[in-house]
Every structure is written in C-alpha cells, then in structure tokens.
C-alpha cells in the first residue's frame, strides 16, 4: 500500500474504489445542502470542508443546495448569511440550487408512486399514526387508510395540492412495510399540508415534501455521485435507497447515475453548544448580543471575534474525517487561530490595566520616536515608529514593591527592559491615602546592551489613544454544557465570558480599519470590531497567547493509597515536569501534543534561563525533550529573554534535525 493510499480518509477510499470499479472521474459531483433556518456554526464547517475539500481534491463540482422545504422556519436572511459564510471560508460552489426548484418534479414522481401502489393518503390524527407505528422492539400495524384505492389517493393528493384541506387533515405516506425493523421504513411521511408563504415560491404550493423524500431525489436530479452527511442520518440510508431505486424506474434514461449516501462523524466541540434551538435561546434571552456575538460558535460570530478562514480550515483538516463520534477540545480551534495570527498579525503595544511610571531622569519636554518591528515572523511586515516620553503606562500586574528572585518584571530596586526602548530601574512609589500605588518612579539607562531578564510592554501617556477593549472568554464554564441530565445548559453560562475594559494604545492604531488584526504584545490577539467609529475604537480579544483553561481542568481523584503516599513526595519543579512531558511528547497524538504544549507554556512561567540552559545539550535522539525545551524557551523569549550564542546554536541545531515537529517548533522562534 502506498503512502498516498494510507493517508486517505475512509470517504476518499470509497471514492477511489468507485473510480477503480469504473466510475468516470468526470462524473464525480458533491453538494453541501444547508437548511436556511438559521446561521451556520462551527459544527457545519466539517461538512462544508469535507464536500468542498473533495471537490478541490478531485477537481469536481460542488453544488450549494438550500434544503428549503419548511417555509415556517426559513428566510432569505439565512440564505444570504449562508452564502456569505461559505464564500468567506474560501470555497466556491458550482451551482446555487434550491430544493424548491424541484417541487414540481417531486410532485410528479409522488403521483407516479401513488399510481404504482407505492404511496397513499392517510387521514388519521398524528397521535393515531404514532400509536400504529410501534416501537423499535414492537412492529407497527397497518392503518385504516393504507389500502385506499389508487383513484381515491390521486384525487385526495391533488386536492391537497389545490388547498382544499386544512393543515393536519391529510398526509401522503410511502407504502413500504409497517413491520419493518427500521422504524423509518414504516410508511414514512412524504408530504404534509402547510399553508405558509415560501421565501422563493410564494403561495404557489400549500403541500411541502419532507426531508427524506426531498433529500435523495434532489441528489438524484443533480446527479450527485456521493451524498455525504453526518452519522445521525445513517438509519435514513435505507429509506434514501428505497426512494431513489423506485424513482430510477421513472427517469433512468435522462438521469442514469444513482447517488450513494455515506455518513461521517459530526463535529462536537467542548465548552460549546451546537443546537440551533439552544443558540436561539441565548439570543432571545439576551445572554449574547445576537447571532454574530463573538462568543457564539456561529461562523459570523467567529469571524467577528477575529478567526480567519485559514485557521478554521486548518482546524477542520486537523480534526479529520472519522466514523465514530467524539468530542474535540476547543483548545485545538484556539491553537489554530493562534498559529495563524502569529504569522500574520502585526505586533503593537497596549496597556489594559495601567499604572503610571514616571522616568525621573528623562527630560520633561523630550520625546523620541523609536523604531519597532511589526512582526518578527514576517520580514515583509516592516517597522513602525512608537513615541517615548517621560511618563508611560505599564500593566499594573507588571510591578510589585517586593518580589522573589523568579519575578522578572519590575520591582523596587529591580531593572527591566521596555520593549523597543530603554532599561528602567524602579526606585520609589507614590501612594494614595489608602496605600494604593498611584505612580512608580524610575530612572532610565541609555545603555540598552545590558542583560536584564524581563521585558515589558508600555505606552507613552501623552500619545496614547483610548479604546474600548472587549475581552471574551468561553461562553460556558462546563466542558459539556448540554450533557447534564439534572441541569439546564443555561446554568453553565460563564459570568466572566465578557469583560469590558478601557485600553491605552500606541498611536499607530489611530487609523485602523474594521477587521484588522493585531497582537497586543504579551496580552493576546485582538481585532477591530464592527462597532468601531471614528470617535471610538472597539477591539475584540480573539484569543490569548496561551491556553488559560489548561490549568483549570479538574484532575481525577487518586485512590486512598496514593493520597496517603502524597505527603511524603516532594513537589516536582516546573523544569522537571517539562522534562517528563518531553520524554513522552513524540509518542502522543497530535491533539494530545497540543494539550501538553499548552501545559509546558504555562509551566514556563516558573522556569528561568538557568533552568533551561543545561538542557540545550540534550542528546539528539531525545527529540521529545528538545521539543519541550524549545516550547518553554519560546515563552521566555516572548517575555523578554535576550537571545545569546547558546540559544542561537540550540535553535539552529534543532532546525537541522530530522524530526519534523522539532524543526517546526524551532522555525517558529
């Protein structure tokens, strides 16, 4: 088996088999068939990615077909939103089609089924029909109208179409088998009376086809080769085949190819609700501001939050195509946007919780415009000028009056480097009557070649522009908010999912445009929100620089014997835990590697250069340990550690290694 064949997912294997068995490649055709009754969400991106991805792989057309058979719930607004979302993701459809395009053909085929004794009009109440249908372990029984004459069925069905009956008076059912082990095959409904205005056909129709009748026949009309849907539709496949095989008898001359339905596991995401009904409840009860609220899992919400098409497509690629349901950790999605924005977002400085720093030996009337690199990951990003003056803001938690040796930020008597500027030393503080610090008085040193361990971001007070900063977090505090049988999902709403702050930003951001993305250095990735105006800028936090939830996940309880032994064990140092992670890193799955990477990034906060440096000489064959060291080193460099010859040599050796993961980590530094 070739490497290429090994890497195929199970759907691609099916397609390759069909091609090998004589299906012409130019007959391949796929479709994405959303119902226009709501906004697309992250769960839909898997279905979109699979169908359009196959279209790209095989150079085959993909139809965007709207399954618009329920006028009670469907609107043009949703059609427009779906088209916008699919196009934004970077996919191009061959044809824009609608199930309503086929209403007349579906009706004509239904009439033919009645004539062949394969469909009948039932006039019972829904309760009576449900009772006759039986259970999964008990067969159904025939209803009193099952053996109506063909003539009576044709007459009633035409009168249903002409609007002579009220909703619920009659339905059309396929005549299959009321004792069938698959309950979906027990005379399923094909048509119901629904006197609602349709967003495309107006009032032309007052009977509407059901999903199972419409879905397969639309595939057949369009000559779709492979009809791909999620696993919950697997029991429907038998009915899908029954309908298409009977219709084939009526149209095989003009429509020679029968489509094939296959199912894949849908996308389930931790800390996320996918149900349209529940998402609607969040909107209606004002928990979120609308369908495009940046906390919503809708594509419009993700777009507004700052997610990119590339990050979402990369996420779908990493999730892959599976046959079994599983839950994907949302941290994988967050990892993908971090990786994407790390390469593309310009770095800027912003302070969100300011404390004033006065540089007492810097002239009051002096200001300088210093050169700052926009993005060290992108040579073409260039440089910008940032103003420096006597009074600046730094983050409040970047200063402590007293701190230990492992605190590398500003403290009394300690020195730090100001990003793109000078080294300062804290000498004194000014406090209010309650003891709260108002100002930190520092002196600066023009000699920037000195080695100091900490680097802080800052903003010149007199040049700062003010903006509203919306810091978003996960909307739910529970990993699986709709799985608790005893609690409503609304009880797991995270009260801290939105925090609004006033930010002080460097003046280069004064002319930004809606949608632009930046890394606020040391804080995270932010984008310009739609609510921004010329008078007031609004930024959304897309994602932090690291996974802040990794350390919050509950750990399983140890058994009693383990608990007894625990007091005798010394707590392992952060560096030893990082080494331990490194030993198993290369044996982990990609998803587990991402989780471990987040934990190493968190542990790096408690690691110094002196801890890491001895590990630079780790044996070549211990790739996992070297990867772990690189991950930690990258965090230290982000927080101001200066590169030296030992660091550069370690990175260059890693770049030349045969291990692809090691090379990738080294290349990111």
Model-derived segments and spans:
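Short coil turns that connect the paired helices of HEAT/ARM alpha-solenoid repeats
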Residues: 586-591, 618-624, 653-661
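A glycine-rich helix N-cap at a beta->alpha junction
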Residues: 78-104, 109-112, 117-120
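Core subunits and conserved enzymes of cellular information-processing
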Residues: 233, 237, 241-243, 310-313, ...
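Amphipathic alpha-helical scaffolding segments comprising HEAT/armadillo-like alpha-solenoid repeats
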Residues: 574-582, 606-617, 641-652
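Active-site cores that bind ATP or allylic diphosphates and position pyrophosphate for catalysis
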Residues: 68-70, 76, 98, 112-279, ...
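Residue-level signature of the C-terminal ends
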Residues: 602-607, 622, 635-643, 650-653, ...
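N-terminal catalytic cores of NTP/NDP-binding nucleotidyl/phosphoryl-transfer enzymes
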Residues: 6-83, 199-230
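Amphipathic alpha-helical elements of HEAT/ARM-like alpha-solenoid repeat scaffolds that form extended
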Residues: 592-604, 626-637, 661-669
């Amino acid at each position: 088996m070739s490497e290429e064949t090994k890497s195929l997912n199970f759907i691609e294997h099916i397609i390759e088999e069909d091609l090998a068995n004589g299906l012409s490649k130019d007959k391949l055709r796929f479709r994405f068939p959303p119902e226009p009754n709501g906004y697309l969400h992250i769960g839909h991106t898997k279905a979109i990615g699979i169908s359009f991805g196959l279209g790209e792989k095989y150079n085959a057309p993909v139809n965007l077909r709207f399954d618009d058979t329920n006028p009670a719930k469907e609107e043009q607004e949703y059609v427009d939103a779906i088209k916008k979302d699919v196009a934004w993701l970077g996919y191009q459809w061959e044809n824009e089609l609608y199930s309503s395009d086929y209403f007349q053909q579906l009706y004509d085929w239904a009439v033919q089924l009645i004539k062949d004794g394969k469909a009948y009009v039932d006039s019972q109440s829904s309760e009576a029909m449900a009772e006759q249908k039986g259970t999964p372990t008990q067969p159904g029984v025939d209803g009193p109208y099952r053996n109506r004459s063909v003539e009576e069925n044709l007459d009633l069905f035409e009168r249903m179409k002409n609007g002579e009956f009220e909703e619920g008076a009659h339905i059309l059912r396929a005549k299959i088998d009321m004792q069938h082990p698959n309950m979906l095959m027990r005379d399923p409904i094909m048509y119901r009376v629904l006197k609602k205005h349709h967003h495309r056909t107006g009032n032309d129709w007052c009977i509407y086809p059901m999903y199972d009748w419409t879905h397969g026949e639309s595939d057949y009309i369009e000559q779709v080769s492979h009809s791909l849907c999620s696993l919950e539709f697997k029991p429907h496949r038998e009915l899908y085949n029954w309908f298409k095989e009977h219709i084939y008898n009526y149209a095989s001359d003009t429509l020679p190819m029968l489509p094939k339905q296959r199912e894949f596991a849908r996308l389930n995401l931790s800390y996320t609700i996918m149900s349209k009904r529940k998402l609607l409840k969040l909107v209606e009860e004002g928990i979120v501001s609308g369908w495009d609220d940046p906390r919503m899992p809708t594509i419009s919400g993700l777009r507004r939050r700052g997610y990119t098409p590339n990050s979402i497509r990369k996420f779908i690629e990493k999730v892959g195509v599976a046959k079994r349901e599983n839950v994907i950790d949302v941290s994988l999605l967050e990892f993908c946007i971090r990786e994407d924005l790390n390469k593309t977002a310009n770095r800027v400085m912003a302070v969100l919780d300011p404390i004033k720093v006065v540089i007492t030996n810097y002239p009051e009337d002096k200001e300088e415009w210093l050169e700052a690199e926009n993005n060290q990951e992108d040579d073409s990003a260039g440089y910008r000028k940032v103003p420096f003056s006597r009074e600046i803001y730094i983050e409040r938690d970047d200063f402590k009056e007293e701190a230990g040796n492992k605190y590398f930020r500003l403290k009394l008597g300690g020195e730090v480097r100001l990003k793109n500027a000078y080294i300062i030393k804290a000498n004194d503080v000014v406090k209010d009557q309650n003891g709260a610090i108002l100002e930190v008085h520092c002196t600066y040193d023009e000699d920037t070649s000195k080695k100091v361990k900490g680097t802080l971001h800052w903003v010149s007070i007199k040049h700062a522009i003010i903006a509203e900063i919306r810091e978003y977090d996960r909307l739910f505090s529970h990993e699986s908010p709709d799985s608790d049988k005893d609690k409503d999902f609304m009880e797991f709403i995270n009260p801290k999912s939105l925090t609004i702050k006033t930010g002080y930003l460097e003046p280069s951001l004064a002319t930004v445009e809606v949608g632009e993305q930046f890394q606020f250095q040391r804080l995270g990735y932010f984008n310009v929100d739609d609510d921004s105006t010329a008078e007031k800028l609004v930024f959304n936090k897309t994602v932090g620089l690291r996974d802040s939830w990794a350390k919050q996940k509950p750990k399983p309880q140890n058994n009693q014997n383990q608990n007894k032994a625990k007091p005798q064990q010394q707590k392992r140092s952060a560096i030893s835990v990082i080494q331990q992670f490194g030993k198993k890193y290369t044996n982990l799955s990609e998803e587990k590697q991402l989780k471990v990477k987040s934990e190493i990034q968190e542990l790096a906060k408690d690691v110094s250069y002196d801890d890491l440096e001895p590990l630079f000489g780790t044996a070549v064959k211990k790739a996992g340990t070297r990867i772990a060291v690189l991950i930690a080193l990258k965090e230290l460099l982000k927080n101001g550690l200066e590169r030296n010859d030992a660091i550069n040599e370690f990175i260059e050796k890693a770049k030349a290694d045969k291990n692809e993961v090691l090379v990738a980590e080294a290349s990111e530094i």
